[in-house]
Structures are given as C-alpha cells and as structure tokens.
Regions:
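Short glycine-rich anion-binding loops that position phosphate/pyrophosphate groups of nucleotides
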Residues: 14, 72-75, 210
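Short amphipathic alpha-helical segments
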Residues: 19-21, 46, 80-83, 128, ...
Length: 227
C-alpha cells in the first residue's frame, strides 16, 4: 500500500503528541511540521523540519499531501477552527489520527481532522463531527452526538444519549450524565459533573480540594495511630 504524505500544522505540545501517535499508523508518511513563520521556534522537531506555511501550496500540492491541524484549545478552540477552515478552503484533506489501541466500533460516524488517543472507548451508534481532540482514557457512550472543534481532556466521560454542540472544552476527569444537551462554547472544568442541560457559553467548575492544616508526616502519623 502506497503511503499518504502528511504534514502536521502546529509545533506546540499537542503537535508533538500527535506526531508520536501518527508514527504508529502505517498508512502515513510523515514529512514535517508547518506553521506561520512568526510561530516557528526551531528549525526541527524530533529531527523533522518545520516549514513556513506561506509556501504550503507551492511546496506541498494538495493532490500529494494531507494536513492534520494540531492546535490547542485556546479561545474555546476557535484558533484551531479558523486554521481548519482555512486549510479546507485550500482543498487539502485532513485525515483523522486515531491511535491503533483506541476502542472504536466500525459503525460510528466520524468527520475529519479528529485526534483520538490511546485507550479511548467509544460505544456504538455515536456521531462525531470535525476537528475534535479526544485524549487518552476518555469514554464516549452510546448514542452520543459530538459537534465540531471540541476538546476532551484525558479521562472525560460522556454518558449515553448526550448531545454536545461546537467549541466545547471538557477538563480532566469531567463527567456528563445521560440525556444531557451541551450548548456551544461550554467550559467544563476538571472533575466537574454535569447533571443539567447547559446553555451556550456555560461554565461548570468543581470546587478545588482543600489543603490540610497538617503536613504529610503529621497526617500519616495520625492515620497510622488511628488504625
């Protein structure tokens, strides 16, 4: 099978992680990273060149090259959405990057430019749009609909029959119970539980843990003597 040449748009932490997963997928031949010139921090990453986006069309024709957009969740994923739309308008294909260990049924519907990491579990009868990042250990349950340009941090859990719109962020180990509707641009913080529908631009944050007055040695001494 002839491998498809591919570039990663981005040179930050998420782009580095995507690169590591992409290298596991045999159908791709990785060429290098590409970003706007003002964001180029170094000439090479992991030994691969970082190209100036200005020369994309000239150097890398769309018939021969694909591009995966790997930009973070800043500005409620709008930065990544803007770049995604720009590259799609130029006619490039943006394939999904899915870790081979991800548990994904064959019958789910998935758009393009989705990053699905290792040990993600997606149940049957799920629809996922475009340009979403689903990090390791996340669970997307049956009959869930996910829109576009969302970010699911590691350990996120979405229960069945839930509908998530666009440009949402879900923090570490956040959970959504079943039959919930989540509007556009919602922010759900780490360890938060969503049990009611969320309107557009809602923010849900779990109270932080309290720092104990005892230090670790005093606390463990108490525990040992208590039992």
């Amino acid at each position: 099978m002839k491998k498809r040449k591919i570039l990663i748009f981005g040179n930050g932490p998420s782009a580095e992680v995507v690169f590591k997963i992409l290298k596991k997928i045999e159908k791709f031949e990785f060429i290098g990273f590409i970003v706007d010139k003002k964001y180029i921090q170094k000439k090479k990453i992991f030994g691969y060149p970082v190209f100036d986006f200005k020369y994309l069309v000239k150097k890398f024709p769309k018939k021969e090259y694909d591009i995966f957009i790997s930009v973070g969740y800043s500005n409620m994923n709008l930065n990544r959405e803007t770049i995604y739309k720009k590259i799609k308008k130029l006619g490039y294909k943006c394939p999904n990057i899915i870790d081979p260990s991800a548990n994904i049924p064959e019958d789910i519907k998935v758009g393009d430019n989705n990053f699905i990491m290792n040990e993600v579990h997606i149940h049957p009868i799920v629809k996922i749009g475009n340009n979403n990042f689903i990090w390791s250990g996340s669970i997307i349950s049956h009959h869930v609909k996910v829109g576009n340009h969302c970010w699911f941090t590691s350990g996120s859990s979405v229960a069945g029959n839930t509908e998530i719109r666009n440009n949402c962020f879900f923090g570490l180990n956040s959970s959504i119970i079943n039959n919930i509707k989540v509007g556009n641009k919602c922010f759900v913080g780490a360890h938060s539980l969503v049990s009611k529908n969320l309107k557009n631009k809602s923010v849900v944050i779990s109270p932080p843990s309290t720092k104990h007055s005892l230090n670790s040695e005093q606390f463990t001494f108490l525990l040992n003597n208590k039992f």
